[in-house]
């Protein structure tokens, strides 16, 4: 099993977990179940991934068979953009809990600091970037005029009610987090961001350390996940798996792979990772990186020096320049 980090509310979270993004619903429940058997205890999901029923099914199966208890599993989900209004926050959370068949979440993120028009579950769920049939015909997205602090305070009420244990933010920049800290009652425990050697975001990571906010990395392998989504930038960016620096570091540690080096570069710097894999040997390899090898300070610096500020998951790019999340 992965080592644990202690969040600012005292809750302990595994440093290595399984990301549920793009796990096909047909195999998802079994993958979650098998991952638990291998030792995984952190599962990072989201309403937008469209597989929460299956994630919950895999978790509940493992619990029912006595492999784990609920308190052994750290379950994560995310509030989607269409449900930012305080009237809809708890509604969306309860939908997630109902789909997963669970009573509470260990961590619930605001997925993006972007508020869309509300879409009822019966109209489309998960709604993705849909804000109504008329908007869809026009290729338009209607925003909702909801300040992020209003959404956050609704989440604080969910903590009070025991529906979630922790609040996190995802895809937020430092200035927005700083503003949130000025007005929140319950501090966010984690920030989930795109983080890999092409996008190290060192100032943001340092800011989080100063404020005792755990950084969680997604897309640890850089362009790899986005090539499958036909993103042009990802297709034209050299893969990190074949990068000379990463390959050299891997060769310095016999038995390690380039993907494991990328993950170890993060965890050794205190950043949690949530890679996805369907192969047992890779799942085990990812889980065991902390025991397997330790990078030298120079290797950490050499990998960090690859930073090129290349961001693949940017709404500005794929939503026609209308949402300046990272501007």
From Swiss-Prot:
Active-site residues are 49
Task: Give the protein's biological function.
Answer: Aldose reductase with a broad substrate specificity. Reduces the cytotoxic compound methylglyoxal (MG) to acetol and (R)-lactaldehyde under stress conditions. MG is synthesized via a bypath of glycolysis from dihydroxyacetone phosphate and is believed to play a role in cell cycle regulation and stress adaptation. In pentose-fermenting yeasts, aldose reductase catalyzes the reduction of xylose into xylitol.
Q: Sorted alphabetically, which keywords does the UniProt record give?
A: Cytoplasm, NADP, Nucleus, Oxidoreductase, Stress response
Out of the domains of life, which is the source?
A: Eukaryota
Task: Report the GO molecular function annotations.
Answer: aldose reductase (NADPH) activity; D-xylose reductase (NADPH) activity; mRNA binding
| Keyword Methyltransferase in record | no
Gene3D superfamilies in alphabetical order = NADP-dependent oxidoreductase domain
| InterPro entries in the record | AKR, Aldo/ket_reductase_CS, NADP_OxRdtase_dom, NADP_OxRdtase_dom_sf
Compartment annotation: Cytoplasm; Nucleus
Lowers pKa of active site Tyr, annotated site positions: 78
Q: What induces it?
A: By osmotic, ionic, oxidative and heat stress.
What's in the GO CC field?
cytoplasm; cytosol; nucleus
Q: Which residues bind NADP(+)?
A: 219-286
Per the UniProt record, one Pfam family is Aldo_ket_red
Q: What is this protein called?
A: NADPH-dependent aldose reductase GRE3
Q: Print the miscellaneous field.
A: Present with 12851 molecules/cell in log phase SD medium. 'De respuesta a estres' means stress response in Spanish.
**Main localisation:** cytoplasm
């Amino acid at each position: 099993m992965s080592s644990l980090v202690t969040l600012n509310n005292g809750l302990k979270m595994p440093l290595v977990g399984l990301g549920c993004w793009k796990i096909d619903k047909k195999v998802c429940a079994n993958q979650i179940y098998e991952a638990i058997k291998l030792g995984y205890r952190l599962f990072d999901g989201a309403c937008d991934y469209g597989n929460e029923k299956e994630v919950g099914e895999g978790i509940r199966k493992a619990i029912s068979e006595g492999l784990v208890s609920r308190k052994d599993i750290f379950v994560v989900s995310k509030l989607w953009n269409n449900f930012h209004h305080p009237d809809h926050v708890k509604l969306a959370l309860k939908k997630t809990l109902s789909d997963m068949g669970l009573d509470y979440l260990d961590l619930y993120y605001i997925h993006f600091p972007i508020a869309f028009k509300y879409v009822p579950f019966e109209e489309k769920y998960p709604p993705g970037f849909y804000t109504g049939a008329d908007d869809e015909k026009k290729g338009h997205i209607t925003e909702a005029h909801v300040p992020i602090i209003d959404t956050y305070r609704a989440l604080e009420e969910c903590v009070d009610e025991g529906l979630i244990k922790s609040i996190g933010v995802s895809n937020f920049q430092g200035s927005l987090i700083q503003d949130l800290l000025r007005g929140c009652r319950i501090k966010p425990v984690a920030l989930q961001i795109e983080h890999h050697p092409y996008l190290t975001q060192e100032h943001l990571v340092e800011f989080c350390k100063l404020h005792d906010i755990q950084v969680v990395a997604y897309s640890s392998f850089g362009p790899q996940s986005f090539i499958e989504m036909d993103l042009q930038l990802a297709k034209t960016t050299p893969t990190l798996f074949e990068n000379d620096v990463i390959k050299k570091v891997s060769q310095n540690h016999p038995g390690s792979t380039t993907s494991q080096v990328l993950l170890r570069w993060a965890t050794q710097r205190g950043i949690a990772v949530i890679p996805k894999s369907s192969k047992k040997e890779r799942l085990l390899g990812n889980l065991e990186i902390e025991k397997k090898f330790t990078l030298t300070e120079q290797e950490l610096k050499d990998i960090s020096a690859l930073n090129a500020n290349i961001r693949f998951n940017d709404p500005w790019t794929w939503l026609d320049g209308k949402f300046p999340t990272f501007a």
